[in-house]
Amino acid sequence: SWCDPATIKYVSGLTGCRAMVKLECLGSQ
């Protein structure tokens, strides 16, 4: 899940786009 903290940490570390991940999480709810 995009909302999973581990996923957010991994993706943000990989792409540097934590804000985008958060937007995806909010948009999916």
Swiss-Prot record:
One of its GO terms (molecular function) is alpha-amylase inhibitor activity. It is found in: Secreted. This is Alpha-amylase inhibitor 2. Belongs to the protease inhibitor I6 (cereal trypsin/alpha-amylase inhibitor) family. One of its GO terms (cellular component) is extracellular region. Keywords: Alpha-amylase inhibitor, Secreted. Alpha-amylase inhibitor.
